[in-house]
């Protein structure tokens, strides 16, 4: 069973990741910095992944034994809102902020990824990590560009599903 004492070692990096992401908010389907940050962390943790849906990421952590596939999803984008606070890690991007907690969702999923990667496969099945862009949509201009690239103009979820995010998944949990 996972208890607080078994995961406390993850907290400093979780906070660091959260603050970095909070400072670098990006709107739907524009999450280039966020996506690169996630990819860098997954590389550090030795977790294979693939980039999909313009800025989305699908990563799988395989267990040593056959079993079900459980997906965990975190949304990545920020909102077009000016942050008005004096946090030391406030948004550095004028007119954009993580007002919905997506920065925390990504930080938490990265911590879960690190934890599961550290188990060295000592579990059944597979854990699929879904880092989804544009959960609350994107600008009409951006959606048109995504559609022209072969993605879905309906947003991040439809684009991720079209890229196979839920293929073989038996259960899915999401942060929001």
Language-model features: locations:
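Acidic/His- and Gly-rich active-site-bordering loop/insert found
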Residues: 1-99, 103, 107-128, 133
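Histidine/acidic-residue-rich, glycine-tolerant segments that coordinate divalent metal ions
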Residues: 87-97, 104, 116, 121-176
């Amino acid at each position: 069973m996972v208890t607080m004492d078994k995961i406390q070692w993850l907290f400093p990096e979780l906070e660091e990741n959260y603050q970095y992401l909070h400072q670098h908010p990006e709107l739907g389907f524009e999450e280039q910095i966020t996506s690169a940050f996630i990819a860098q962390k997954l590389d550090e943790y030795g977790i294979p992944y693939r980039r999909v849906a313009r800025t989305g990421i699908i990563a799988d952590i395989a267990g040593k034994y056959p079993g079900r596939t459980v997906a965990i999803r975190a949304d990545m984008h920020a909102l077009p809102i000016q942050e008005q606070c004096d946090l030391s890690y406030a948004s550095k991007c004028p007119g954009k902020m993580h007002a919905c907690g997506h920065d925390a969702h990504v930080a938490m999923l990265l911590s879960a990824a690190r934890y599961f990667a550290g188990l060295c496969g000592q579990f059944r099945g597979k854990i699929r990590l879904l880092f989804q862009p544009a959960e609350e949509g994107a600008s009409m201009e951006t959606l048109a560009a995504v559609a022209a690239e072969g993605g879905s103009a309906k947003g991040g979820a439809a684009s991720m599903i079209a890229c196979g995010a839920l293929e073989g998944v038996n259960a899915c949990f999401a942060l929001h």
